[in-house]
Curated annotation (Swiss-Prot):
DNA polymerase involved in damage-induced mutagenesis and translesion synthesis (TLS). It is not the major replicative DNA polymerase. The keyword Transferase applies. Keywords: Cytoplasm, DNA damage, DNA repair, DNA replication, DNA-directed DNA polymerase, Nucleotidyltransferase, Transferase. It is found in: Cytoplasm. This is Error-prone DNA polymerase. Its EC number is 2.7.7.7. Pfam families: DNA_pol3_alpha, DNA_pol3_finger, HHH_6, PHP.
Length: 1070
């Protein structure tokens, strides 16, 4: 006679561990963040929580960090749920470090066997078991179980995981729970596996059930209404109170969870990372080889191959850094970065380190960074120190068009089993969340798209009723309200893993035993399942192999200058501190210049008036959220104004300049002055904050670095508050006034919004100066470099070309008889010796025209010129589509005449195929009327995105004048507060995070650019005009201060209809 199933646990709240839990890193399955699940398990008093995302360890570090923050007696188990191709579903839990490595490698095998976002594992992959891992067989959710098949599966798992396998009993408070429990206990008995309680949790709280339904519908590519039984029947797949579980599960099943926990000892803290060692030659140690390279680098830097002429201060810093690196064991890290930089330079690839690494004289000696230690701004503790609980971080920028060469070098040198890129977590933002929720709810696609197009990245809050009405939705409808609520809930959820912009992790042993590796979307790329924050949290080293478009533009520009001058010209040949460069920048003439071409930077330039290199360092750093929100900008500008008036800058002084009896107060009167003198008494950089904490508040250098880290975490975790009291007390003890102490704390808090290290700003300032010199002194080559390196920068080719022409650069159109693929320099006919070159636009600017076709044109033209379109098509093997694109761009004009004529010939002149291939077929030439100027403009913008003819608004000026619009040039001379109205093509839209909802527009007419400020209230009231207009009329009031002129918008009018078919696109929210 069969025994009755065990009764529920008699204890009201027995001890329990959840062994099967999915986070939202099981994409489109889990409905809670890892942090929420850990917090909920701790709150419910669980003994342990296992994070078991599907074929993934992507969420475990976040769970680990949350547990650290909570400091609660909850044990975190690491595992993964695997759904095999054969139908078996199993959860594996790692018991120790070796088992964790095997699990990570198994996940890697599954992920590498499939395309991005998928995995493929079979029973064969588990045939020998996974030593050290515990296995839970998870029955299907079917109401009627196939007992025989499940017994067979459970036995199979039990044989491969002897004494380490269980049958998971998951009950969901359904009407069949009793029958399901009885059946699962019988199956466990027949298979010889102990049963264990589990929830298969998808969310931390039942309130996430609606969101879980949305995710399930998205995964199945159906609406919620169509999903039917594929949706969970209730909200029970959550982390419940233990008392609830006690009523649901027999006591022995709950107790079994604790026996499993007792066998799991692995913690993520056990992960240890060793850097590659093969870069060290025989007979050398990492320390000795690094020292040799540094000594060679110092001699190279100082231009003396034999002697050591390093200044004593630099020599002392070298010895200090080498000792510190040796003590912390980071020699191999520096050697690896040096090897990548050496490879790049050997290939002629421009590169430069940046970030905190520019504080290191070792990085400078190795050629990784370019900031000269003689500048006197290096603070090595910002980069590496004994008290830092994190590894150093070296970021190196490479030319964006050639970075792939460096990436593939890493893969070749270390192998894919040891090197991979870090991940980036792509999260739902306002627009993507709205679209996906609306799709799951089955809302009308047309209305949904209208609403989605009106949402931007900054729309993180609830959808405003007026936006819903404009899209045709009723804001009072329960379904629409559900859309708004679920969209808000989904924003911030991970959507998928992408690849980091360049963060490489390279290991001495197998990387996939440290973290799973999967295929990236790009061919020949592999990505780990952890992102930058995960790596930092575990103290794992990475190298940032980053891409920077300006480096490509500089190399291309310098190559053109070299060719034009007939001798090599490099960055080292650019004259330093050229006065004409600073005059240009002080007039906000910086379109195309690295880092200082944005609206905010251009507004700052005439106020700051840079006159030397260090001014550029400040310029780069001061227009950042940290200094702005910390209130540093106006005090700094006021200090500069005092200097111009020969007035002194005051610095805070302690009231006890000498040590007292017990030695408590020992600051020197000029301590603060030495820190702040170069920024005129105002802290602009993170390093200055750290130095002030040391000299004014008594922090150790390591404590000061902890303060710096707390600045970065302030917005997320409020970690800065615990340092505030220490700062205030330390400064009071050293005799500084409370006013200065409070102001410094407020400024430090501002840095929580993102401020630059001084070393990073100095690295960027080098590129600012070089690009500014090229713009000022070699404008034609600079324009070519920028155009040949697109897409990059702040401005589209149209604005770059217009700006260069305003500076006197002659720009010649793209033509098949003269153009290469790239833009080139060309001597003008009858030009005098030494005259500036013109720019010949390249065929790459013709939208839709391919590089291979362009190279065939150049090769054929090199043999002999093209007499006509037919010959061009024949010899360059161009099809009708390619000829049509060239004709539409005006590139056939030298052979065919105007566009209509060219289009006619293109239609008839493509190279014959088949039996007629290579044959010359003569057709009569038609004579067509030339297109009007307006038609030419429309065609230019359609195929090129710009025009070399008159500006579109020049053709509309008469109409705009009747509407009483003035030009951009006219308002530059208007007095402050004068009412004005202008109309222009919208070239860019910006919304800085520090602007409190204000939007900044740049509009362009035939006379230049105008800056428009649209305050938050007007943005919401006239959202369609602000975000959708191509030709915008602005009614407003002038805001003028010196050379800086803005128009504060009061009313906006969309005049895009005046443009007709002309396509003018803007670069928005760059």
């Amino acid at each position: 006679m069969d025994s009755a199933p065990p009764s529920p646990s008699p204890s009201p709240a027995p001890a329990y561990a959840e062994l099967h839990c999915l986070t939202n890193f099981s994409f489109q399955r889990g409905a809670s963040h890892p942090e929420e699940l850990v917090a909920r398990a701790a709150e419910a008093g669980y003994t342990a929580l296992a994070i078991t995302d599907e074929c993934s360890l992507a969420g475990v570090v976040r769970a680990h960090q949350q547990l650290r923050r909570l400091a609660r007696p909850l044990k975190l188990l690491i595992g993964s749920e695997l759904r095999l191709v054969d139908g078996l579903r199993v959860v594996l839990l790692a018991t120790d470090r070796a088992a964790y490595g095997r699990l990570a490698r198994l996940i890697t095998i599954g992920r590498r066997a499939a395309t991005k976002g998928r995995y493929q594992l079979t029973c064969a992959d588990l045939d020998r078991g996974i030593p050290g891992c515990l296995a839970l067989v998870v029955p299907p959710d079917d109401r009627i179980l196939d007992a025989a098949a499940l017994v067979a599966d459970a036995r199979w798992v039990g044989e491969r995981f002897p004494d380490a396998a269980w049958l998971a009993v998951e009950l969901a408070c359904g009407p069949d729970d009793g029958r399901r429990l009885e059946a699962l206990l019988a199956i466990a008995s027949a298979a010889g596996l102990p049963p264990v309680a589990a929830t298969g949790a998808l969310m931390h709280d039942p309130s996430r059930r609606a969101l879980a339904d949305v995710l399930a519908a998205l995964r199945l590519r159906v609406t919620i209404a169509e999903a039917g039984r594929a949706l969970a029947p209730n909200a029970e797949r959550a982390l419940h109170e233990r008392a609830v579980l006690a009523r649901r599960y027999p006591a022995e099943l709950l107790a079994e969870t604790l026996r499993i926990v007792a066998r799991c000892h692995f913690r993520l803290d056990e992960l240890r990372y060793e850097y590659p060692a093969e870069l060290v030659p025989d007979g050398e140690t990492p320390a000795s080889w690094l020292r040799r390279l540094v000594e060679d680098g110092l001699r190279w830097r100082h231009g003396r191959p034999q002697d050591d002429l390093a200044p004593p201060k630099v020599r002392a810093q070298v010895e200090h850094e080498l000792a510190l690196i040796a003590e912390l064991g980071f020699e191999a890290y520096f050697l690896t970065v040096e090897d990548l930089v050496r490879f790049a330079r050997g290939r002629g690839i421009l590169c430069q380190g940046r970030g905190s690494a520019a504080n290191s004289v070792i990085c400078w000696a190795l050629g990784i960074t370019e900031v000269d230690p003689e500048l006197g701004i290096m603070l090595v503790e910002r980069f590496i120190s004994k008290e830092r609980d994190e590894p150093p971080d070296i970021d190196v920028d490479f030319e964006h068009e050639r970075r792939e060469e460096v990436i593939q070098y890493v893969y070749r040198k270390y192998g894919r089993e040891r090197a991979a890129l870090a991940a980036t977590v792509i999260r739902y933002r306002a627009r993507s969340a709205l679209r996906d929720v609306g799709r799951a709810l089955g809302l009308p696609p047309g209305q949904l798209e209208r609403l989605a197009r009106d949402r931007f990245w900054f729309d993180a809050g609830r959808i405003r009723p007026e936006r819903l009405r404009e899209a045709g939705f009723d804001p009072a409808s329960p379904g629409v309200q559900r859309l708004a609520t679920l969209t808000e809930a989904l924003v911030g959820f991970p959507r998928h893993l992408s690849q980091h912009v360049g963060g490489f992790v390279i290991a001495r042993g197998r990387l996939d035993e440290l973290v799973p590796v999967e295929n990236a979307a790009m061919p020949e790329r592999t990505v780990i399942q952890w992102d930058k924050d995960d790596l930092d949290a575990l103290g794992l080293l990475k190298i940032d192999v980053l891409a920077l478009g300006m480096l490509s533009a500089l190399r291309r520009s310098l190559a053109l200058v070299s060719t034009w001058r007939g001798r090599p010209f490099t960055l080292a040949d650019i004259p330093r501190e050229a006065p004409e460069v600073y005059r240009m920048l002080s007039e906000a003439d910086s379109i195309g210049v690295f880092q200082i071409e944005s609206r905010a930077q251009m507004t700052m330039l005439p106020r700051l008036k840079p006159a030397r290199f260090y001014d550029l360092v400040v310029q780069v750093a001061i227009v950042r959220p940290g200094p702005i929100q910390g209130g540093m900008v106006h005090p700094y500008l006021q200090a500069r104004a005092r200097i111009e008036r020969d007035e002194p800058v005051s610095y805070p002084q302690p009231h006890c300049p000498d040590a007292d009896a017990d030695g408590t107060c020992v600051p020197r009167p000029d301590d603060v002055r030495r820190v702040l003198e170069r920024t005129l008494g105002v802290p602009i950089f993170q390093e200055q904050v750290m130095q002030l904490a040391v000299v004014a508040a008594g922090f150790t250098p390591g404590e000061a670095d902890q303060l710096r880290r707390a600045m970065g975490a302030f917005r997320r975790h409020g970690e800065l508050e615990r340092y505030r009291a220490k700062l205030l007390a330390g400064m009071a003890a050293r005799g500084y006034r409370a006013e200065f102490a409070e102001r410094l704390c407020d400024q430090i808090e501002g840095f929580g919004s993102y401020g630059f290290p001084e070393s990073h700003a100095a690295s960027f300032a080098l590129l600012v100066y070089c690009s500014a010199w090229l713009k000022c002194c070699e404008p034609a080559a600079f324009l070519c470099g920028l155009l040949n390196s697109q897409p990059m920068g702040f401005y589209a080719p149209s604005q770059l070309i217009q700006d260069a022409r305003r500076h006197g650069v002659v720009v010649l159109g793209a033509e098949v008889t003269a153009s290469d693929w790239d833009c080139t320099l060309e001597a003008l006919p009858d030009a005098s010796p030494g005259a500036a070159p013109a720019v010949r636009l390249g065929l790459q600017l013709v939208k839709g025209f391919g590089r291979e076709a362009a190279m065939r044109i150049v090769a054929a033209r090199t043999e002999r010129p093209f007499p006509n379109v037919d010959e061009l098509a024949l010899r360059a093997r161009l099809d009708a589509a390619a000829l049509k694109r060239l004709a539409e761009a005006g590139a056939l004009e030298p052979l065919a005449g105007h566009r209509r004529q060219a289009l006619w010939q293109a239609a008839a002149g493509h190279a014959p195929e088949g039996v007629l291939r290579g044959a010359r077929i003569a057709e009569p030439r038609a004579e067509l009327a030339a297109p009007s100027e307006a038609q030419e403009l429309v065609a230019d913008y359609a195929r090129l995105g710009f025009t070399l003819g008159r500006h579109p608004l020049a053709l509309l000026r008469a109409k705009l004048t009747t509407l009483r619009f003035v030009t951009a040039a006219e308002i530059r001379d208007y007095p402050d507060r004068k009412l004005a109205r202008i109309a222009g093509l919208v070239t860019c839209r910006q919304r800085p995070g520090t602007a409190k909802g204000t939007l900044f527009l740049t509009v362009e007419d035939e006379t230049g650019l105008a800056n428009v400020i649209v305050q938050a209230e007007l943005v919401e009231r006239q959202r369609r005009e602000v975000l959708g207009a191509r030709l915008l009329g602005v009614f407003g009031q002038i805001r003028s201060k010196g050379q800086v002129v803005h128009l504060l918008a009061q009313r906006l009018v969309d005049h895009s209809a005046l443009l007709g078919a002309l396509e003018a696109r803007s670069r928005d929210f760059q």
